[in-house]
Amino acid sequence: MSFQQKEREKLAELMLEVGPDAPTLCEGWTTYDLAAHLFIREHRTHLAGGYVVSALKDLTRSAQEKAKQQESYEHLVNEWAAGPPLHIKPLDSFMNVSENFIHHEDVRRGSGTVEPREFSRAVETKLMGAAKMMGKMALTSSDVPVVLTPPNHPPVTLGGKRGVAEQGDRVVRVKGEPGELLLWVTGRDAVQVEIEGNEADIQEVNRQL
């Protein structure tokens, strides 16, 4: 079973355990909202454009609310837990390594601080790759270069319209495990990372997806 499949299974189990009204790290969303999001994203792909295109946000938001009105929480979770439809399966790794991990942590950490999980080197490599990919999108408008620095993997430099200074003193360095860095670049603050740099530069960092 792949990493994203294991995360799907664990997230579904946790969502059924905590119920539809549990908090998540997704601002304003309960687990019911998250279940509807996961369902729409894979099973109503023609309505999911608002997750990536701002002009379609109202359409997707409406579809999400309609799914909650028409389907029970358990149905939405179980439909998603059964796996992606056939036309999406070839894209499962590309689409869901970060998605399933991030939302699993959104529920795990939604009600308070949770210790990060430990992963194999192979999984860490996947998560670091996802952090790089998501970070390129999230930090594209940031003027300040951000260097993600995991303990056992090469550092990754993101953002920074002005580039990294020769002395490297006008950068923000974020240190943490790959999974924590992935959560941080996607806007989560309930993470265990160390952020180093000039305070003004840190305040300039703009994480936006």
Give the residues covered by each predicted segment:
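An N-terminal domain-cap segment
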Residues: 1-50
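Short, contiguous, pocket-lining structural segments
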Residues: 2-7, 26-30, 65-68, 92-95, ...
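Structured surface interface patches that mediate subunit assembly and partner/cofactor docking
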Residues: 3, 18-21, 44-59, 75, ...
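Short, charge-rich amphipathic segments
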Residues: 27-40, 56-57, 63-66, 136, ...
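Short, structural beta-strand-to-alpha-helix junction motif
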Residues: 30-31, 72, 177
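Acyl-thioester-dependent acyl-group transfer interface
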Residues: 61-77
